[in-house]
Amino acid sequence: MTAAALIHGRNAVLEAARAGKVVKVFQAAGLGHDPRLDELARLAPIEVVPPERLEAIAAGVHQGVAAELKPRREWTLKELLATNPSLLVALDGIMDPQNLGAILRSAEVAGADGAILPEHRSAPLSPSAVKASSGASELLRIAHVSGIPSAIAEVKRAGIWCAALDVRGETAPWDFDLTQPVCIVVGSEGEGVHRLVRERCDVRLRLPVAGHVSSFNASAAAAALLYEVLRQREGSGRTRP
């Protein structure tokens, strides 16, 4: 079993099981009652294992549960764009798996149709990232691309606006129409969105701050902007069915 095929954590495993992505659940012997475990037992085969075996196969805080996943479908960007998405998220240089997972979770909660990740200069979809996403990574269509700049150009050719989160941006999110098809581009904590990516985006959106710290972290900023997308779309009646 490869690391990429294994996830851990009760919420992440449960969401993957609800989506029909789980082959088998490994559950440590002696766990107390939890309704999530009851639901898991109805959704997927359970193998009760000694706690030390679970420690050996599941790194990190696993909460007594790990799962083997079915192979994740690999989407190309062309296939993703053929689904006529109204909301995409592109991640430019997100190297921390916790940030990666948190952004994917926010994207799925906000109704995103998919995510675009670079093949290089990105944290992998590791068990830690999947756990941080609470299983959202197993629900989203995810396309890996050779480079974000060329991907942005392709997204724009499909008629989708590209909006970069940028601390030096000139536009507040509520001053931009986020009800139209849009791809939100999120950069890394230190560097932000890279220059060539920024230049190819249609608009740079800035989240105003009132404190002494200059910016939100990447996952918090993404969550705030994705919430604004959802707020505008609910107000216009254009949320995804």
Language model segments and positions:
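N-terminal positively charged helical leader segments and presequences
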Residues: M1-A82, P241
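Short secondary-structure boundary segments
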Residues: R10, A29, G93, E119, ...
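Structured adenosyl-cofactor binding patch, chiefly the S-adenosyl-L-methionine
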Residues: L14, A19, V109, K131-A136, ...
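Short, ordered loop/turn segments at secondary-structure junctions
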Residues: G30-L31, P51-L54, H120-S122, G147, ...
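Short basic, glycine-rich beta-strand/loop surfaces that mediate nucleic-acid
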Residues: A59-K70, S133-A136, T179-G187
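RNA substrate-binding interface of SAM-dependent RNA methyltransferases
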Residues: T83-T171
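Active-site/ligand-binding-proximal alpha/beta "capping" segment
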Residues: A163-N217
